[in-house]
């Protein structure tokens, strides 16, 4: 039977198939729906199973990878689930595989883009390769500029407004020339319709752009695609739906008022283009204070009811009357429910306040003027870290609250704090250093709010930012839709936001306080807060009904069902779309079993049937089709009825056990196609070189051991395939152990080069080059054996010497590149399943100055020259150290500590370069036996399995 390279493609189901496709590659999953086929994909299931918290990121990366035909996706993932890092994993893979030429990130404002850039550089598994040299010593503007430059070869960042203006005047040819084969990311895409650009319809310009480009991967990011009504979803989906699936008004899917009329039609149109992920389970630490208020019409929202004082109630009644003529704004009532000045002014009139009025409010009777601010101050005073959200800044809003806090003894944070204190930070649109303040708030030394314990945020922080270790979130102002409130809450309840508390063994708990100010007395106006929450709940129920349709029809519905399915105790809750938590995925008739079973019995039974009958019709086999086709595409070997090696192959709509390759391909390329899931188009120079190496390798090994220069023999050996380099090292170790005297000079040169990869163990000479644990080999004087239990304990103890070091860091040395790296193990032993979470070594000169000083001065305690400040007093040295923003309290405890810190942080001509500090650290690691040889040191693409 002839072999086609298509026999070795990794197959994924197409969204739709025509009659002409039946029995061909495009009909690789006959009789199965797209969703049913995808539900059993091994790679995607493995990603979710191995990492329940972040496996969705690997799932989406695989879904949009070079192996699949899928190129657009609405990433409808709840706020705080790590959408940015999901996108980065897709973009980085596309870059590595050559699938795309670049990545353009579009967002509503510069703040969101800066946050995306920061996440890309520091938090999304990019290994530090985008961190600019000298980052720690730069100012804020220079940091942003250098980070943009570091990623500029692949990433571009534009606001919706500026990008729309740019592409609106470009021809289709110009757009394709510049943006074909790009990863296109649209962050918080639900805002696109509301963005205004002078002289340009922003939505139309970007929609045209998306329909013009070719070969692109398109990702729309949102945690809230609908804000006021379900019909808003159409504008979002139409950006990626093909022309024949576009949702038009005349289709009648949504009514003119935005209600969903045809749920089945909506589900059909979005098939294969939505990924849906809920937030962590409601019982995982997020709780809501208060209760459902009676007499409001609300059924689900738990609110904190606060009764206004008689003084505030009287002012509120006047404010309500002033709003009577404009029932759509209620600005007076809303401002008055926040706070009333002692002279009975509120809102814009409160801007004319004087210090004595503020001091009067800030005293013991704050509740007299603001029942909400009094509640917040009491919460913040007893909580390590608190976040308060308020729509209003001026008038009775956050500006007034800031003045009250200052009068109460709080200090305002700047982001440069070096000493503990009772501080708050104000984050508004006028702030230029929001990210600096947030970074200081999130710093590891502020886990318990020692430097900043209270954040006051306006709408500018409602999206994109993460506030870590917050214990209490206080919502001061509701909104007419609940989406705004949910976004604010998500700032302090996000993926990884409380990991440091978990690491300390503490229970993670965030309490949300949604405040409702209610006027005192019977004949008083209604509470505007209560009215707004009631309206938002009604809207939210309509939106959640549509959200459930998207969840059940999502491409990854079955794959993420374990994450999205909440316990039945939450039936009827908002978290379960106000209905039953249990649900079924559309077009998935049978949920695949656990992964081990998926790959086991069912496929084996089908193969046995094919072996017996000589072939079979997949459509009538009692087996999950995706499982069978996974066997086909993997090229897995079986034994046919005659005892010969064979593979499952699709032929004319049947499955057959066939020879791996035809007799005409027995030669050079037969072995190539037996072992690689590739098509001809994917062959590159690396594959050709690898095949050529198979013929030339024996000669190269012979030359290495006979005529190669001794000075470069190690570098030459390390460039060979891993298994060859390992075999050479094992032969050299055995030759020395057996007392061989032939070719001693070259043998010893190789042994010296690889000295960090072998040692005498309890059972004999042990080699672990390119191998760990049970893969290591042991020479007992007669033969090489797998590592036994004693050897495994020996290797584990050797590894523990590095990972359990008292200073939390150890050195790595690449004997080939002569590079020195440092690995951070301060967080202890990591999860050995999720390799992405492992810390790996980074070149010493790439670490920031603050961390290097911390290691060399405080952990290693390397003293400086004896003649450095020999006569200075402790007081004099403390005064100098306190002027340096890098200093910590421990640097001031003794003359020795102070002198060390001042020595390593000298300024001007005496300033130590990173290279100088690294030389001292390298020497210390060697002297303390904490330097490990590792060939990944100095490489961007590290194999994390080596660090597990």
Swiss-Prot record:
Residues 64-243 form the Helicase ATP-binding domain. GO terms for molecular function: ATP binding; DNA binding; helicase activity; hydrolase activity. Its EC number is 3.6.4.-. Keywords: ATP-binding, Helicase, Hydrolase, Nucleotide-binding. Pfam families: Helicase_C, ResIII. Residues 371-554 form the Helicase C-terminal domain. Disulfide bonds: none annotated. PROSITE patterns: HELICASE_ATP_BIND_1, HELICASE_CTER. It comes from the Viruses. InterPro entries: Helicase/UvrB_N, Helicase_ATP-bd, Helicase_C-like, P-loop_NTPase, SNF2-like_sf, SNF2_RAD54_helicase_repair. Transmembrane segments: none annotated. A motif (DEAH box) lies at residues 187-190. ATP binds at residues 77-84. This is Putative helicase 009L.
């Amino acid at each position: 039977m002839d072999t086609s390279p298509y026999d070795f493609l990794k197959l994924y189901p197409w969204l739709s198939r025509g009659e002409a496709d039946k029995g061909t590659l495009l009909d690789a999953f006959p009789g199965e729906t797209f969703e049913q086929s995808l539900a059993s994909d091994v790679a995607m299931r493995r990603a979710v199973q191995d990492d329940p918290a972040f496996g969705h990121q690997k799932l989406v990366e695989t879904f949009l990878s070079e192996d699949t035909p899928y190129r657009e996706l609405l990433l409808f993932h709840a706020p705080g689930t790590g959408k940015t890092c999901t996108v980065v994993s897709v973009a980085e893979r596309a870059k590595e595989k050559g699938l795309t030429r670049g990545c353009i990130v579009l967002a509503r404002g510069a703040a969101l883009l800066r946050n995306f850039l920061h996440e890309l550089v520091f938090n999304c598994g990019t290994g530090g390769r985008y961190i600019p040299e000298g980052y720690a010593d730069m100012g804020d503007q220079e940091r942003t500029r250098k980070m943009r430059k570091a990623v500029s070869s692949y990433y571009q960042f534009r606001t919706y407004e500026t990008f729309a203006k740019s592409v609106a005047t470009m021809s289709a040819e110009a757009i394709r020339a510049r943006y074909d084969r790009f990863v296109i990311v649209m962050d918080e895409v639900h805002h696109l319709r509301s963005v205004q650009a002078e002289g340009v319809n922003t939505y139309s310009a970007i929609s045209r752009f998306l329909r013009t480009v070719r070969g692109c991967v398109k990702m729309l990011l949102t945690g809230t695609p609908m804000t006021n009504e379900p019909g808003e979803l159409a504008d979002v989906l139409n950006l990626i739906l093909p022309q024949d699936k576009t949702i038009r008004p005349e289709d009648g899917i949504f009514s003119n008022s935005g209600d969903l009329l045809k749920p089945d039609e909506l589900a059909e149109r979005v098939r294969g283009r939505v990924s849906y992920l809920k937030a962590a389970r409601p019982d995982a630490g997020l709780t809501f204070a208060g209760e459902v208020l009676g007499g409001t019409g609300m059924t689900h929202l738990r609110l904190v009811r606060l009764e206004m004082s008689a003084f505030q109630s009287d002012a509120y009644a006047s404010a309500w009357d002033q709003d009577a003529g404009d029932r759509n704004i209620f600005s007076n009532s809303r401002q008055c429910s926040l706070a009333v000045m002692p002279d009975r002014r509120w809102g814009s009139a409160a801007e004319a306040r004087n210090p004595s009025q503020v001091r009067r409010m800030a005293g013991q009777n704050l509740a007299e003027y603001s029942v909400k601010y009094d509640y917040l101050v009491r919460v913040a005073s007893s909580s390590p870290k608190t976040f308060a959200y308020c729509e209003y800044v001026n008038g009775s809003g956050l500006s007034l609250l800031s003045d009250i806090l200052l009068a109460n003894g709080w200090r305002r944070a700047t982001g440069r704090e070096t000493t503990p204190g009772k501080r708050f930070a104000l984050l508004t649109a006028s702030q230029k250093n929001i990210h600096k303040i947030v970074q200081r708030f999130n710093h590891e030394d502020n886990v318990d709010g020692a430097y900043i314990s209270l954040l006051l945020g306006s709408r500018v922080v409602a999206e994109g930012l993460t506030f870590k270790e917050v214990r209490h979130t206080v919502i001061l102002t509701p909104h007419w839709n609940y989406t705004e409130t949910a976004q604010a809450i998500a700032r302090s309840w996000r993926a990884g936001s409380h990991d440091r508390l978990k690491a300390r063994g503490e229970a993670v708990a965030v309490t949300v306080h949604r405040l409702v100010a209610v006027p005192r007395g019977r004949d008083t106006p209604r509470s505007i807060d209560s009215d707004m929450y009631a309206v938002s709940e009604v809207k939210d129920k309509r939106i959640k009904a549509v959200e459930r349709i998207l969840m059940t029809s999502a491409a990854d519905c079955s794959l993420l069902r374990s994450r999205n399915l909440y316990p039945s105790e939450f039936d009827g809750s908002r978290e379960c779309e106000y209905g039953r938590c249990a649900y079924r995925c559309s077009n998935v008739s049978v949920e695949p079993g656990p992964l081990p079973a998926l790959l086991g019995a069912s496929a084996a039974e089908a193969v046995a049937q094919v072996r017996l009958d000589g072939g079979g019709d997949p459509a009538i086999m009692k087996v999950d089709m995706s499982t069978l086709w996974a066997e086909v595409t993997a090229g897995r070997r079986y034994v046919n009825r005659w005892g010969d090696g064979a593979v499952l192959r699709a032929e004319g709509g049947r499955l057959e056990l066939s020879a791996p390759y035809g007799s005409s391909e027995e030669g050079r390329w037969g072995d190539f196609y037996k072992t690689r899931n590739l098509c001809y188009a994917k062959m590159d120079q690396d594959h050709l070189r690898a095949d050529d190496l198979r013929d030339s390798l024996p000669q190269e090994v012979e030359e290495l051991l006979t005529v190669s220069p001794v000075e470069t023999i190690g570098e030459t050996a390390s460039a060979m395939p891993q298994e060859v380099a390992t075999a050479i090292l094992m032969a050299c170790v055995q030759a020395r152990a057996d007392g061989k005297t032939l070719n001693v000079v070259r043998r010893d040169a190789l042994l010296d080069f690889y000295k960090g990869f072998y040692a005498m163990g309890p059972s004999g000479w042990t080699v672990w080059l390119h191998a760990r644990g049970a893969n290591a080999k042991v020479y007992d004087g007669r033969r090489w054996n797998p590592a036994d239990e004693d050897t495994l304990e020996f290797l584990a103890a050797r590894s523990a010497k590095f990972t359990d070091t008292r200073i939390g860091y150890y050195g790595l040395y690449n004997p080939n590149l002569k590079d020195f790296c440092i690995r951070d193990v301060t967080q202890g032993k990591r999860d050995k399943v999720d390799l992405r979470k492992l810390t790996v070594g980074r070149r010493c000169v790439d670490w920031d100055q603050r961390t290097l000083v911390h290691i060399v001065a405080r952990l290693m305690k390397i003293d400086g020259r004896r003649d450095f400040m020999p006569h200075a007093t402790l007081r004099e040295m403390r005064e100098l150290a306190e002027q340096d923003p890098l200093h910590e309290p421990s640097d001031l405890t003794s003359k020795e500590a102070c002198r060390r810190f001042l020595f390593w942080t000298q300024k001007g001509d005496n300033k130590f370069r990173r290279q100088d500090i690294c030389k001292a650290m390298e020497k210390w690691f060697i002297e303390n036996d904490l330097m490990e040889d590792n060939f990944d040191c100095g490489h961007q693409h590290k194999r994390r399995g080596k660090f597990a």
